Regions:
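Short linear sequence motif anchored by a di-proline
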Residues: 1-307
C-alpha cells in the first residue's frame, strides 16, 4: 500500500498548468477547522503556496496559518518550560540520592527537550525541505477534481470516507487511503466511474520487510517528472451537516523494479492527455475508465531508503 507520498512543491503553479482553479473557499474552511482541531494535518508546502497568493481569500488563509503557528509555538514553549523544570528537579534528586526513577525522569525530560527544540526551530525556519511536502494517512493534500465541467483543486484528507457511511468507518477500515484496482467494482463501486480525482506527487513511500525489520523505501520516477496519481474521492456529510472531503489513491500490481524490492502494490500515474476523461467518467462505461488506467505513464522507479 502507498502509505505516504510527497506532493509536488509549488503545487499551485503545477496545477495551474492543468487548467484547474484553486477552491479558496474549501482551503479557507480547512484552515479555519485546523484552528479548532489540532488533529487536522496539512503539509507545510501547502501552507507555503498561500504566502505567494494574492486576494482577500488568500489573505484570510494566511491569517489562519499565522494564528495556528503562533498557537503551536506557544504550546511547545510551555511544554519546553515544563520539561526543563522536570530535568532540573531530576538532576537535584540525583545529586542528593540517586534513584532509577530520577534517572529515568532525567532521560525522558532530556529527550522531550531535544524534540521540542527541534520542533520550534523547524517552525521558525523560512525555507522548505523535502519532508515539508510529505503526506500520510489522515493528512490533507491538494487534489484535482472536476465539478460542473471545470477542474478544481480542493484540499482532501488522505483516507477516503465514502458518502453514507458512519463516522467510525475510519477506525473500522483504516486502510481506505488506498483503493485496490481489483476492488474498484466491489468495495469502491459507489465511487469508481463516478467520483475520480488526481493527486500531483513527486514520489511515494512503501513499507517493506528486510529480514526481521521493517524499512521505508522511497520511490521516484527516474526522469524526476511529477506524476498525476489516479484517485477516487468522496464528499461525506454528517448528521450535523459537517462535511468531509476525502480521497484514496488507486493501486495496482507493481512494475518489476518495485516488485523486486519486496512490495506488491504501486500507484497509477495517469497520462496528461487522459486527465479530462478520467475526471469526467461515464458510470455506464467502466471499460473506458479501465482503459485509462491501463494506458498509464510507465516510468522506471528508482528507490532508496527513506531518510
Amino acid at each position: 500500500m502507498c502509505y505516504s507520498a510527497q506532493v509536488v512543491e509549488a503545487w499551485e503553479v503545477f496545477v495551474a498548468k492543468t487548467g484547474a482553479d484553486i477552491s479558496l473557499l474549501d482551503f479557507a474552511r480547512l484552515y479555519g477547522m485546523r484552528l479548532l482541531d489540532r488533529s487536522v494535518r496539512i503539509p507545510r508546502a501547502v501552507d507555503a503556496a498561500f504566502a505567494r497568493a494574492t486576494g482577500d481569500a488568500a489573505q484570510s488563509i494566511r491569517t489562519a496559518i499565522d494564528s495556528f503557528n503562533r498557537q503551536q509555538a506557544l504550546t511547545w514553549e510551555q511544554e519546553l518550560f515544563t520539561q526543563r523544570r522536570r530535568l532540573a528537579d531530576a538532576e537535584r534528586a540525583l545529586q542528593s540520592r540517586p534513584t532509577k526513577s530520577a534517572a529515568e525522569s532525567r532521560r525522558i525530560a532530556g529527550q522531550k527537550i531535544d524534540w521540542l527544540r527541534g520542533k520550534l526551530a523547524d517552525l521558525r525556519r523560512s525555507g522548505l525541505v523535502a519532508d515539508d511536502s510529505r503526506i500520510f494517512p489522515g493528512w490533507y493534500a491538494p487534489v484535482i477534481v472536476a465539478e460542473q465541467g471545470a477542474k478544481r483543486v480542493m484540499p482532501m484528507r488522505y483516507q477516503c470516507r465514502p458518502a453514507g457511511v458512519p463516522a467510525d468507518h475510519d477506525k473500522r477500515f483504516p486502510g481506505t487511503y488506498n483503493a485496490r484496482r481489483d476492488k474498484l467494482e466491489g468495495y469502491w463501486r459507489g465511487l469508481f466511474g463516478r467520483s475520480h480525482a488526481v493527486m500531483p506527487v513527486r514520489r511515494f513511500y512503501e513499507n517493506v520487510r528486510r529480514g526481521d525489520a521493517n524499512v521505508v523505501l522511497e520511490f521516484s520516477p527516474a526522469d524526476q517528472q511529477p506524476m498525476l496519481v489516479a484517485c477516487l474521492w468522496s464528499r461525506w456529510t454528517g448528521p450535523d451537516g459537517s462535511t468531509l472531503l476525502s480521497f484514496a489513491a488507486i493501486t495496482d500490481e507493481p512494475p518489476p523494479e518495485v516488485a523486486a524490492t519486496g512490495h506488491d502494490r504501486c500507484v497509477i500515474p495517469i497520462k496528461p492527455e487522459h486527465v479530462d476523461a478520467w475526471l469526467n467518467p461515464d458510470p455506464k462505461n467502466l471499460a473506458a475508465c479501465y482503459a485509462i488506467l491501463d494506458d498509464r505513464e510507465r516510468p522506471y522507479y528508482e528507490h532508496r531508503l527513506a531518510a
